[in-house]
């Protein structure tokens, strides 16, 4: 009888040990700074809104092809590492800002293209119960929009525009006076939509939460000839930013067509 009791106790102890092991979380590995890295930017702020400050550092280095890679670190732990998208981005910086209206600050991680289109990338990260979550990330395209959009000159100073992703379409009317002496170039208008070059963060409805609007220029006969802008608005839903609407806006700021997403 005593032997049976001892065996039962040993089995119970082993079971508790195994359960304990299964519930243990793996420890985070500390970020290792190498000789190839340099500090691009460092900020010290109260991220949680609890009166205690944290250090956020953006490191930069070059990969095997000589392209920049940036790593975002909070204290001694990596948040994320982003590359240059095959050379599309050459510069980067960070900004700490409360965008979702909750207690604390989010990290806005910007990357920049230094070409004439001025493309930008933006990823936003939020510290939630000790873990970093990405709450905003919109892919940016540097192919002049040819995979997604279709543009064609229709004659009579009109350009058809269609977005295959959202179904948004419109006929853009041009101002004839802008093309005096260059009318022959109008037939050359084809698909040309710049990458996202601006992110407008604004609390549109005054609820304490910032909406984000991305801005892309729609190009006519040359890059110096924008004929409209494509603006997509994102709103926080279920903890992250989701697209709400897309608008085609003329160069005077008037909305030509809008579609809910």
Residue ranges with predicted function:
Residues 38-47, 91-99, 198-204:
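Beta-propeller blade termini
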Residues 11, 22-33, 119-261:
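Acidic, small-residue rich beta-repeat scaffolds with periodic aromatic anchors
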Residues 18-20:
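C-terminal motif of bacterial Sec signal peptides marking the signal peptidase cleavage site
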Residues 7, 22-46, 68-70, 77-80, ...:
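N-terminal, intrinsically disordered, polar/charged segments of Gram-positive cell-envelope systems
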Residues 1-5, 10-12, 22:
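Positively charged n-region of N-terminal signal peptides that target proteins for export
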Residues 91-113, 120-124:
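Hydrophobic/aromatic-rich structural module bridging two neighboring secondary-structure elements via a short loop
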Residues 49-59, 99-111, 206-215:
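Acidic/hydrophobic-patterned starts of short beta strands in beta-sheet-rich repeat architectures
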Residues 61-64, 113-116, 219-222:
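Short glycine/acidic-enriched loop and turn motifs that connect beta-strands
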